């Protein structure tokens, strides 16, 4: 019983910490962004085995809603995320050419392994391969920025 409370308290603390951070300097952002872009993202040739169906797209949207919206917003474009502009490097817009240029295999690799120093956590072991591939499918079909509101956790 104490473990779930500890986990919830830790997650809440991590989310609230982001709300108190000052925006990074331009130099800091450039250095961290440069470093992030030097990371070799693997799995380039892997193909998404999850077929594009309404059911699989809904599963990807649901998994994204559970694991990704706290940082990336419902639309994948950080809408309503209060600390998005204070992260160093800034959280990427998941519809941006910089993100969408990745192959499906590379997107899965990023979700599996995370990216340091960006703060993107690794999900390997937390999510099944099918869940990750469904999230990748969802990332290819994100709604327009601001069209679906902001995460409920930040709207109060």
PLM segments and residue spans:
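Short Fe-S-cluster ligation motifs
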Residues: 98-112
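Electrostatic cytochrome c docking/interface patches
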Residues: 27-63, 155-156
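Bacterial signal peptide processing site
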Residues: 20-22
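C-terminal motif of bacterial Sec signal peptides marking the signal peptidase cleavage site
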Residues: 16-18
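Flexible coil segments in periplasmic/lumen-exposed cytochrome c-class electron-transfer proteins
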Residues: 24, 42-43, 65, 101-104, ...
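Periplasmic/extracellular electron-transfer cofactor-ligation site
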Residues: 24, 39-40, 55, 61, ...
